[in-house]
A protein has these predicted regions:
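Long, hydrophobic N-terminal alpha-helical segment
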Residues: 1-41
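Intrinsic, low-complexity N-terminal interaction/targeting segments
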Residues: 11-25, 70-108, 122-128
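Short, structured motif recognition centered on aromatic/hydrophobic residues
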Residues: 33, 38-44, 106-110, 118
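A short, structural micro-pattern
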Residues: 36, 62-65, 84, 102
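Broad gene-expression machinery/nucleic-acid interaction feature
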Residues: 39, 60, 87, 103-105, ...
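A low-complexity, Ser/Thr/Gly/Pro-enriched, surface-exposed linker/loop concept
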Residues: 46-51, 55-80
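Mixed-charge, glycine-accented linear interaction segment located at domain edges/termini
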Residues: 107-146
Length: 146
């Protein structure tokens, strides 16, 4: 096992990062917006998709999104910090404003319709493993027809 430390500075980088965090689980209380640093941070139990299929491990990882101008949530209750969320994807949509090619919105999408929408100055993210891995109880499965 080699810990991940990925940097995203372009939408294509964020797509790679999104593949690594698919099926991560976290609690609502594991997310925070650091207003003074204009940074959003979430800590999750990430499935190690980068390992061979016979290995099923999870690791505690931190995802940081920088340059936040505005943060919004949908269908995520901040008054229930123990609620469990399953992360589906992280996406970047550029603004359609002329002269603002780097700015856009990062969407962190969860199962059940939950979403964090972050207006950002540019695509800027860090994903870093912060613990040793442990055996996963099962490998996440996806319906091929979905």
């Amino acid at each position: 096992f080699s810990p991940l430390r990925l940097f995203a500075r372009a939408p294509a980088d964020l797509d790679v990062m999104s593949a690594h965090v698919q099926d991560a689980v976290l609690q609502t209380g594991d997310m925070t917006f650091l207003d003074d640093k204009r940074r959003f941070v979430l800590v999750m139990n990430r499935f190690c998709w980068e390992l061979p299929q016979k290995e099923s491990l999870r690791v505690r990882s931190a995802l940081q999104i920088g340059g936040i101008l505005e943060a919004k949530r949908r269908n995520i209750r901040s008054d229930k910090p123990d609620s469990v969320l399953s992360l589906l994807a992280v996406r970047f949509a550029p603004n359609d404003q002329p002269g603002d090619a780097l700015a856009g919105t990062v969407s962190i999408i969860f199962s059940g319709g939950g979403e964090i929408r972050l207006a950002v100055e540019a695509c800027e993210a860090i994903l870093e493993d912060i613990t040793e891995p442990w055996p996963a109880t099962r490998r996440p499965a996806h319906d091929a027809n979905a």
